[in-house]
Amino acid sequence: MCGICGQFRFDGKKVSSKSLDMMMSKLARRGPDSSGKWIEGAIGFGHQRLSIIDLSNLGSQPMVDEKLGLTLVFNGTIYNYKSLRALLVSLGYIFFSNSDTEVIIKAYHCWGVECLERLDGMFAFAIWDEDSQKLFIARDRMGIKPFYYNASSKAFIFASNSQALLTQDLDKSINPVALQQQLSLHGVVPAPNTIINGIQKLKPGTFIILNTDGEIQEKTYWSPSAKRPSENISDQEYIERTHELLTAAVTKRMDASDVPIGVLLSGGL
């Protein structure tokens, strides 16, 4: 559970290091192992790290790939990063770390926004593309990893929690509709709303592209299918398939870690 934050300014001002520090202070509990900060004029990223894959400093963030002109902050885990890395190596990419973070950078450089179709995992990340001068942001299909943001004519700011955004100058008034949802829907406020008017959530399965003028392009790259299975199978076959899927899901998560694994059993499964 890492913490990410960032600012992309459109008003001609540079990102303030102190302002970024204020945001990172509200993310510290999410990443106790190390912290990192990167500022380049009007764009700046902050990261609080909880080390899971590649525990060395080479896996630290924000991760900068100077050769590709890309900088990334990322929260999450890419379960199939090893197979993606092998594919990218076969395509000529050279890696300097063993992290899934770097796999995202190379995948984005190789396939652009289509890289999202290849990522199997839980994630929220932001990539600054120096060549195109654009910011690319994406959230995983089910919205497991959080991504909160505020968009104005002056700047686009984002973080893994709303507390980090509340350190900034934005509308902090209560959204009454979202508050009612918070209290009546078991604490769930459907994206993009939050109980704070000046803070939004990026929808699951969605990406955003921003340019230096503050223009925002938002697109849904995945949504669940509402179609019923065409096959006519028995209840026992459904049980067996569910067991197979759960086994496969647990297995791939166990393979994506360089630290000891713990298991929490609820009463549900």
Regions found by a protein language model. Give the residues of each.
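Cysteine-centered catalytic environments shared across enzyme families
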Residues: M1-L269
